């Protein structure tokens, strides 16, 4: 809704494992908005979702579900691997005119260390480094 009227909403799913009930809306609605409207509409939506195992999350908190979305036309998937990439990819995700799934590995939220850029940094999608 908000993305359709000029806003750039950022949604956060507590765990990526819980995104599955929203799969139809993400793939069939948001990702195809530009195509369905013949380029008249865009859907600048960023969805953040921590994913992955190795953090003692158990059965429902350890899945890596990014492959479910990876082949969806109109949807961009980003997974940062460094603090530097995390900042740049998040800013680029927010500025994108198409929906972006911003997956963060749960381990990276606590254990990843490194420097991020002090300046405003933008990453180009489809490149490995900012």
Place the predicted regions along the sequence by residue.
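Conserved thiamine diphosphate
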Residues: 1-130
């Amino acid at each position: 809704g908000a993305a359709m009227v000029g806003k750039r909403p950022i949604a956060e799913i507590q765990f990526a494992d819980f995104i599955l009930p929203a799969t139809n809306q993400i793939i069939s609605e948001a990702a195809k908005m530009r195509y369905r409207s013949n380029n008249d509409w865009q859907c600048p939506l960023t969805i953040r979702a921590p994913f992955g195992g190795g953090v003692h999350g158990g059965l429902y908190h350890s899945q890596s579900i990014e492959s479910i979305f990876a082949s969806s036309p109109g949807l961009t998937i980003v997974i940062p691997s460094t603090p530097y990439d995390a900042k740049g990819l998040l800013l680029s995700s927010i500025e994108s005119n198409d929906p972006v799934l911003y997956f963060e590995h749960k381990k990276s939220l606590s254990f990843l260390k490194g420097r991020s850029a002090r300046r405003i940094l933008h990453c180009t999608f489809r490149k490995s480094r900012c």
